[in-house]
Amino acid sequence: MMLIATDPSTGEVVREVPAATPGEVDTTLAAAEAARSAWRDRGLDGRAEVLHAVAADLRARADELAPLMTQEMGKPISEALGEVEKAAWCAEHYAEHAAAYLATEDIASDATRSYVQHLPLGTVLGVLPWNAPFWLALRFAAPALMAGNTAVLKHDPHVPGCAEAIGDVFARALSASGAPQGVFLNLPLETADVAGVIRDRRVQAVSFTGSSRGGSAVASVAAAEIKPAVLELGGSDPCVVLADADLDAAADTIALSRIINAGQSCIAAKRIIVEDAVHDALVDRLRDRLAALKVGDPRDPATQVGPIARADLRENLHRQVTQTVQAGARLLLGGELPDGPGWFYPPTLLDDVTDDMTAACEETFGPVMAVLRARDADAALTAANATDYGLAASVWTTPERGEAMARHIAAGQVSVNGIVKTDPRLPSGGVKRSGYGRELGPHGIKEFVNVQQVWVGPRQG
């Protein structure tokens, strides 16, 4: 079985990598298990040495790593370079802050001393998607490794070159520091083979990023094996714009949020819920900004919107747009399949969308913006929560009003007057069908530790 990477800007196959055989899977898991004791005993300073080396290697090789993303999943080169830097920052952040995050906590009780310490679980499997190959790998691996676990990366089969390159970065860092290679290993697999790896006794936990359907499948297997899982799943993120918002700033940020990575982001603003009083003014601004975007070759540094990653994804996106227009939404921009090679899709603006239309009910994974009207702030809040998803949200209003509204939005993170983004310093994750558990920040590193309570009685004798 081959894992095949296709350039989405041309439709041409650019790489074929053999999937791991059952024997190679066994060898990989055995190596990860064998490395656990040495990695755990290396201590935080020794682990930090490796993560700092990973960060340095990512930065030194950014010009060769970033084009892999552009080639295999169509990310514009300017964004790809930014992603490599963000991945390096994540490694660096946990190298510098894991000791504080994992510090032993003394807790008063009837003991002479009682405390909580954070111990590694063992080997953590990361099952990751294609849309941010380097960032998501480091988001998973950096905290897991700094907590003393070993990590096995099962990346999306459409980005095998990225996965190999990530494995090589870690291999160099581990070799230079004298750590076992089994601390971090790349495992090229088809999606159908993941369940067997989760069931393996040598895997203690799993981190999954991807669709709600995929997350449900992973959660079912992990639950049957009584293994912890963190799920970061899809989102249909609301962006609420109230009458007292700065419309120019809101339009700039909303347009940027929706077209980063050609709109293929779980935390992008997808449902723009606008108070009636400023609806027309905001829509005019959004249309102007989307119309001015440069769509084209992702290798061109001037390109702002690249292709959709796969043909089937573009077909599904166009279906969502078509069904929404057929249901009564107004198509103000885009919405047509372009001629020529590759899987491009134009920035698309849909107005007068209602919460029962396809573009509001389903997650749209592409540069498609759906605008919904709300008569007032209460109606906007109701619309924001009218979804099965709960990953992220944003609110444009006064800071005080935005913070008050955030408490009533069912989402794992809310940005007030700013773009929703992931940050190594801050936890992120979802509720409802957007998953459970948290990535990043002090909360993320504690997802894959044994929070061990120790109770010490008086000295005997």
Label the predicted regions.
Residues 1-112:
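N-terminal Rossmann-like NAD(P)+-binding subdomain of aldehyde/semialdehyde dehydrogenases
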Residues 107-249, 374:
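Rossmann-like NAD(P) dinucleotide-binding subdomain of oxidoreductase/dehydrogenase enzymes
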Residues 13-20, 35-41, 126, 239-242, ...:
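Short, well-ordered beta-strand elements within core beta-sheets of diverse protein domains
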Residues 10-16, 203, 321, 326, ...:
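Conserved C-terminal structural/oligomerization subdomain of aldehyde/semialdehyde dehydrogenase
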Residues 213-354, 416:
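ALDH superfamily catalytic-core signature
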Residues 36, 40, 55-62, 66, ...:
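Structural signal for hydrophobic packing residues in well-ordered secondary-structure cores
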Residues 11, 47, 69, 91, ...:
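Residue-level signal for inorganic ion chemistry
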Residues 8, 22-25, 44, 62, ...:
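Residues at or immediately preceding the N-termini of alpha-helices
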